[in-house]
Amino acid sequence: MPKRMSRAEWERFLAGRRVAVLATLAPDGQPVLTPIWYVYRDGALYMRTGLESIKARNVRRDPRVTVCVQDERPPYRSVTVYGRATVEPEQEGLDAAIARRYLGTVGGAFYLRTAREAVEQSGEVTLVVRPERVLTQDFSPETPLVGRLWLLAKRLLPPGL
């Protein structure tokens, strides 16, 4: 059985560099899932999207969302946030914070320069998700030390060994 994370643990987990999967609702009620970069700060998830993107349109119509963030390698962990999203104007510095988070200082600066024209043409908004309920899973206690050492070795060794 996975253990539950404390609030401090899941907030630290969300602050790590992982890609989220945002679920919004289509007009017919069908879930629409989208991998998306985010920043977690001040108790909320902040994401950027186009003004008229499917995500933004879905949230304007029905603000209920789910966001799942996971570790894709053992020991598996995940945080699923249930809440309501708001569509807010562009926030100063948020693009830079997200780009740096995922691409580093140099890569983030390059990304911002190359994406600026597309961003300006589409118009950008911020999706803000404030957690109403959080579900966590942490399988770390179930991964024995030998298994953890093997996983570490696999990451360090060339593929195929």
What do these predicted regions represent?
Residues 14-15, 60-61, 120:
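Alpha-helix boundary recognition
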